Amino acid sequence: MNRALLVWGPAALWAGVIFFMSSLSQVPGTSFLDHVPAGDKLGHLVLYGMLGATLSRARRLQAVPYAALVLIGALYGASDEWHQSFVPGRQVSAFDWIADLVGVAVGLWLAHTFFMERPMNPVASMTPPPRPGAS
């Protein structure tokens, strides 16, 4: 399997989901967010938190610095806000972009906190290390 696809594929796929959703004038299934204080920002936080979590694979598999991953997420969020300026019924908001940025950072932090310390191959972690002197 192509290593670049393994490292960046999940983030690219999720970025595609975000692009698709922001292409819609009204995102289905989100009307409940209208009744939640700052529900729109919560939606951005969750979507971009998932992007941050998928970007964390690059940190784990290629040692990409966190600052670079946050920058990638921030630039994607800015491009998504610009993209929304062409979608009827959508508008550009700096506050949405800030929610995107915070979401990426929180997603990276959560992925690091809960998954970075664990081995990627759970079977390998169950294999006991060889004993000294044993052949």
What feature does the model see in each segment?
Residues A58-D80, Q84:
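Membrane-embedded catalytic cores of phosphoryl/pyrophosphoryl-handling enzymes
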Residues G29-P37, A78-L101:
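Interfacial helix-loop-helix junctions of multi-pass membrane proteins
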Residues R3-L6, P28, L61-V70, A94:
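Membrane-helix interface segments
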Residues M120-S135:
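Short, intrinsically disordered terminal tails adjacent to the first/last structured region
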Residues M1-R57:
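"…centered on the first transmembrane helix and the immediately adjacent amphipathic helix/loop
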Residues G9-F20, V46, L71-S79, V102, ...:
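Lipid-exposed faces of alpha-helical membrane segments in multi-pass integral membrane proteins
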Residues R59-A63, H83, V87, Q91, ...:
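Membrane-interfacial segments
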Residues L47-Q62, Y66, V102-F115:
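Membrane-interfacial alpha-helical segments at the cytosolic side of multi-pass membrane proteins
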